[in-house]
């Protein structure tokens, strides 16, 4: 079962290539990214988290990332049931071990049809099955 990040990965890579986006955390990485995308005499902007792109591509990048995120959520729901998605995230954040579902709730906040109430219900229904501690 794929995670949301895995569903987004290939689409993001295509967008990064189209918008000449790269990640740099040092002057050397900055130069390497500029060289890879043949960027010369172009104003670059930081998009956060080390992500850098030419200024003229910033809006396209931002809008593209938002679209990929929303489309990938819908793809996730299409590929997996809501119940399986919630169980995947409860397990991923070790909620059955810690008893704290807040990270799961936060991660699924943008999923249509998934609420904190539903997550609590699925957590309680499956607690004994998945809590092996």
PLM feature segments, named:
Residues 1-133:
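Soluble, non-transmembrane alpha-helical interaction regions
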